[in-house]
Regions:
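A short, acidic/glycine-rich surface segment
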Residues: 23, 91-92, 199
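Flexible C-terminal active-site loop/helix
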Residues: 1-14, 18-32, 38-45, 65-70, ...
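A short, polar/charged loop-to-alpha-helix boundary motif
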Residues: 51-60
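Hydrophobic faces of well-ordered beta-strands that scaffold small-molecule active sites
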Residues: 14-16, 35, 40-44, 77-86, ...
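Short, flexible, glycine/charge-rich loop motifs used to bind or transfer phosphoryl groups or to couple energy/partner
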Residues: 70-72, 96, 155, 203
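Short, glycine/acidic-enriched capping/hinge loops at junctions between secondary-structure elements
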Residues: 26-27, 44-46, 54-55, 93-95
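Catalytic core of soluble alpha/beta enzymes
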Residues: 113-254, 280-285, 289-291
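Active-site beta->alpha loop and helix N-cap motifs at the rims of alpha/beta catalytic domains
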Residues: 52, 72-130, 134-138, 144-150
């Protein structure tokens, strides 16, 4: 990839900070650089704790989105998405599902330092009660559990009819062991944090660590690499789920392109995890891509110039992001 000159990136970069409606992975603000390029907007939003090597892959994705022609068709008018329930009380979980229009599929956050197993179980039970018997439930532990702890938790919640558990443990070796243990009850495992680079999938396949892989466009370096990763996963007999990295509508749009392609190839493609704009208290486009009832209407993003001004990050954060951009650009 031959990236656009750094000066051009800096000239069209807007550093923004968006408040979250609910704390997510310990965050209360989501920071990003939005590039207002002549060919349309793109987003660069690696989490602040990521090192420059990892963040540079996200930058490659942002550059690809607006400075290189896509090999994929434009996304369809709508795509299927799951709802997402963060680590909230059962009552709040029920309220969120109602506000989301009762999506057919819901991902429930479990594990982590802010929620006990008892609280996790109660949350999942509330989601099952709200969805009824035909709704589909996914769990996402973000690698928070130890091996035996994960097995105990999954067996405890088995009665809630769980489709699969996303990254229940951190290491691939433990994922492989847990997958063998879970085979008897028919609950699959999905690799998310384990897939951060294109080559990571090779280790997942070699160790038999997952049934499903979670694909996020920015961390993999763009749509081309994400598409190649999907083809490799399918060749190995794995299913894929397209998911967000808690992006604005700009990032969600580019990921929706990939989901739309999957749905065009397979009408039974798994619902995407792209309905996360609802966790942002504001957005930087004229028509935010907010899901309802398990559907996400997809419109090409048009930046809201007033929002870019209103949501502009503080001077010190802007300087931090621009310095990060220069460092990461040098690694491309």
């Amino acid at each position: 990839m031959v990236p656009s000159p750094l000066s051009e990136l800096l000239e069209c970069a807007h550093v923004v900070s968006l408040a979250l409606t609910t704390p997510f992975r310990g965050l209360t603000q989501r920071e990003a650089i939005i590039f207002d390029s002549p060919r349309g907007p793109s987003e660069w939003s690696p989490f602040v704790e990521y090192d420059d090597a990892e963040a540079s892959l996200w930058l490659a994705s942002a550059i690809e989105d607006c400075w290189h022609d896509s090999t994929l068709p434009e996304p369809p008018a709508s795509i299927r998405v799951n709802g997402t329930i963060p680590a909230v009380s059962p009552q709040e979980a029920t309220t969120l599902i109602t506000k989301a229009g009762f999506p057919h599929t819901v991902k429930v956050k479990v594990g982590g330092p802010t929620s006990s197993l008892t609280e996790d179980h109660a949350r999942v039970q509330a989601v099952r009660a709200a969805l009824g018997p035909t709704g589909r439930i996914r769990l996402d532990a973000n690698g928070a559990w130890a091996l035996d702890e994960a097995e105990h938790a999954i067996r405890l919640m088995e009665h809630c009819d769980i489709d699969y558990v996303e990254q229940p443990v951190e290491s691939l070796a433990d994922m492989a062991v847990l997958r063998t243990r879970m085979a008897e009850i028919g609950i699959g495992l999905a690799a998310d944090e384990s897939i951060r680079r294109w080559a990571d999938l090779d280790a997942v396949i070699a160790q038999g660590a997952a049934d499903i892989v979670v694909i996020k466009v920015q961390p993999l370096g763009g749509l081309r690499r994400a598409h190649d990763t999907i083809k490799k996963a399918h060749a190995a007999g794995l299913q894929v789920v397209i998911s967000s990295a808690l992006e604005t509508s700009v990032g969600i749009y580019h990921a929706a392109t990939l989901q739309g392609f999957l749905e065009s190839q397979n009408p039974h493609a798994l619902d995407a995890g792209l309905g996360t704009v609802s966790f942002l208290g504001d957005d930087i486009v004229e028509s935010p891509l907010r899901a309802h009832g398990g559907k996400l209407s997809v419109t090409k993003p048009r930046l809201d110039q007033g929002a870019l001004t209103r949501l502009r990050a503080s001077k010190d954060r802007e300087q931090w992001w621009r310095a990060r951009l220069e460092r990461c650009f040098a690694l491309l």
